[in-house]
Design a protein with these regions (language model features):
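N-terminal intrinsically disordered, cationic/polar leader segments
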Residues: 1-36, 41-89
Length: 89
């Protein structure tokens, strides 16, 4: 969760087995380096769903994804007002 006033992400850690319900985001560049910004929702064994920014994960069996490559370049830049890496087309 990103706190705009603090300009800081507050990470949550979820442990145990989960199934991916949704995974969406972008892979682009910041200052010429690859940068991913992913959001994930995942359900535990009882069906409770948790979610947020995906910083790291370990896949135990499979992870099916569709990746769409677009023509052109999308970069990001650091916005000083919000502290976020915003799109630059």
């Amino acid at each position: 969760m990103y706190n705009v006033d603090e300009h800081q992400y507050h990470a949550l850690t979820f442990t145990g087995a989960h199934e991916i319900v949704s995974l969406t985001g972008t892979v682009n560049t910041v200052n010429g380096e690859y940068y991913s910004h992913l959001h994930m929702s995942a359900a535990n064994e009882s069906g409770a769903v948790v979610g947020g920014h995906l910083n790291a994960a370990r896949v135990s069996a499979t992870c099916e994804m569709v990746i769409r490559v677009i023509d052109g370049a999308v970069d990001r830049f650091k916005d000083d007002a919000t502290g976020l890496n915003l799109f630059k087309f």
